């Protein structure tokens, strides 16, 4: 998996860029699916990343139930509806042919829209982060990580 800053300890490992298509689906990069053990028909949890920022974390439901997320995930009753806990959005959805279908409600909750380009990175051992590329560019530029910004343009799009 490419690092945004090869040779720099702690640099984010990127899986690629996922695009939210006009019919509201996005693909999970294949290497991310392998790394996190995501299979066809898995139920996954989408959760707000940083409050007030676009994007979300994606966690397999079975994995989330073994973590601190369990207390929230246990309360979610339906698929593809947004549930709010502690001002963070949570939703369940499923993987179909390596893709995740979103709804207008989910897009609104995660401050996204069709055409959004999401950088898929290793967030934690259980979570893949999908954050708008523009947010990453702003944060990296603020810290002078221009090589990482340049490397983002070399990532595969899905």
For the regions a language model picked out, list residue spans one by one.
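The feature marks the first
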Residues: 2-38
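DNA polymerase processivity clamps
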Residues: 40-48, 114-122
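Short, charged beta-turn/beta-strand-edge "cap" motif at the junction between a beta-strand
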Residues: 32-33, 50-53, 106, 124-127
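Intrinsic disorder/low-complexity detector
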Residues: 1-17, 47-98, 127-158
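Short beta-strand-centered segments at strand-helix junctions
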Residues: 22-37, 94-111
